[in-house]
């Protein structure tokens, strides 16, 4: 039952393409393997489909690269191959787990542009998992922020970056170094992230929140809807956050 969901409905890109690709299989064979497992295509039709995906993800000389092994590719090319494998069965949704972490900045931008392009041309939904708020601002339509294993806020990207509701979201944005002078101290969130194996009685961020009240630690806090947004906070804020700007 899970095989019908994996790759066909939901597929995944891992953050480290070098360890995700099979080192003893050619690029073409790895894409064809997915096509054989999850589509009715066989033989030359399957290989033609694999070649088509290499073209879609922007691999140069795709016919030659079909016969290449992973060690012959650059980091950016390996990630493009991973994207081709993930999309070869034409899933409805793609989960991208830190897809640019192992890449340099210029290649990161290329991969993000590719994902945005494929989202539009292939009509797929993308769930991007990342710690990089700059990446979120660049590609996301909606943002879900997690803290200590819980979703604490969900909003459109525009609302999240201009008027975040949860104290953790607000503090996180204020801690961004962009636009600050070298002589300026960076704002930091006090305390440490709690251990996830402990028992929680209230808000998981309460111990680090400057605006926490006694009731924040007494009862489990649930996600509440505010318009088309959701926030896990008893006392959400709605005034704009003044973010650092570079001159």
What are the roles of these predicted feature ranges?
Residues 68-73, 77:
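Conserved ABC ATPase signature
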Residues 3, 95-99, 103-184:
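P-loop NTP-binding/switch modules centered on Walker-like glycine-rich loops
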Residues 18, 24-37, 47, 51, ...:
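Short helical segment in ABC ATPase nucleotide-binding domains corresponding to the A-loop/adjacent helical element
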Residues 45-64, 173-174:
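Conserved ABC ATPase "signature" region
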Residues 31, 83, 107, 111:
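Hydrophobic anchor residue at the start of the ABC signature
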Residues 156-247:
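Charged, flexible cofactor/metal-binding loops and thiol motifs
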Residues 88-92:
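A short, proline-enriched helix->beta-strand linker immediately N-terminal to the Walker B motif
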């Amino acid at each position: 039952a899970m095989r019908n969901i994996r790759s066909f409905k939901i597929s995944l890109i891992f953050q480290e393409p070098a360890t995700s690709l099979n080192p003893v299989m050619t690029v073409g064979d790895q894409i064809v393997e997915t096509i054989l497992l999850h589509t009715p295509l066989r033989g030359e039709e399957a290989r033609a489909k694999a070649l088509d995906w290499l073209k879609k993800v922007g691999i140069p000389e795709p016919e030659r690269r079909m016969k290449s092994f992973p060690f012959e590719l650059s980091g950016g090319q390996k990630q493009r191959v991973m994207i081709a494998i993930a999309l070869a069965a034409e899933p409805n949704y793609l989960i991208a787990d830190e897809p640019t972490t192992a890449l340099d900045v210029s290649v990161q931008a290329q991969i993000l542009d590719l994902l945005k392009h494929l989202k539009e041309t292939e009509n797929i939904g993308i769930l991007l998992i990342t710690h990089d708020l700059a990446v979120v601002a660049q590609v996301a339509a909606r943002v879900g922020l997690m803290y200590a294993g819980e979703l604490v806020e969900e909003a459109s990207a525009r609302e999240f970056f201009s008027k975040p509701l949860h104290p953790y979201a607000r503090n996180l944005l204020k801690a961004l170094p962009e636009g600050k002078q070298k002589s300026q101290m960076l704002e930091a969130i006090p305390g440490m992230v709690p251990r996830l194996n402990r028992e929680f009685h209230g808000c998981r961020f309460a111990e680090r929140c400057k605006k926490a009240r006694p009731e924040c630690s007494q009862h489990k806090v649930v996600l509440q809807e505010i318009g088309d947004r959701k926030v896990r906070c008893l006392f959400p804020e709605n005034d704009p956050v003044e973010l650092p700007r570079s001159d």
